[in-house]
Amino acid sequence: MDKRVPHPLFKLATELGPLLIFFAANAKFNLFVATGAFMVAIVAAVIVSYVVMRHVPLMALVTAVIVLVFGGLTLVLHDETFIKIKPTIIYALFAVTLYVGLMLGRSFIAILFDQVFNLTPEGWRFLTIRWARFFLFMAVLNEVIWRTQSTDFWVAFKAFGVIPLTAVFAMTQMPLVKRYQIAEATAEASDSERGDTSPR
């Protein structure tokens, strides 16, 4: 199926939109209403992404499934713990997936992030390790915040702290990407090897 490249602002809107709805609903009502609104917004974002791009990035799809599962548990059991540990589960799952990929001689980072650039096997390996460590850091950070801070603070961090932190980290990886990026002339030949971290 044909994949369309969306405007960066569209991608930002589909990622930030549900979080802003979550924050606004929590501020006006409570965490349980916010959780329900967040679940609806996540599903809407996935549908819109598919309509516009003709596909849904794997990371967004996995996140949506976990949001629905843990959000549903939060509402059914009326226990806010489930929605609060949801980010921890997501970050830990991504980190484990990346590390398992390295053990298998593959880098799943290209699939996870729907990347379009081509890197050498060494570059993919370094990038995978860095992102796996970042995900572990975010998992620990989420645990610390929801266990030590108020619900409102945790919601605000989720809405306004996670994306900036991720964006800053991603930007700090650009020198590595440029250093190990495969030249345009050989990029086409490397398509079949994308994400391969096995030694040559």
Swiss-Prot record:
One Pfam family matching this protein: IspA
Localization per record: Cell inner membrane
Broad class of where this protein is predominantly found: membrane
Keyword Transmembrane: yes
UniProtKB keywords: Cell inner membrane, Cell membrane, Membrane, Transmembrane, Transmembrane helix
Keyword Protein transport attached: no
InterPro entries: YciB
Highest taxon listed in the record's lineage: Bacteria
Gene Ontology cellular component list: plasma membrane
Membrane-spanning residues: 32-52, 56-76, 93-113, 126-146, 153-173
Lipid bilayer topology: Multi-pass membrane protein
Record family assignment: Belongs to the YciB family.
Function description: Plays a role in cell envelope biogenesis, maintenance of cell envelope integrity and membrane homeostasis.
Name of this protein: Inner membrane-spanning protein YciB
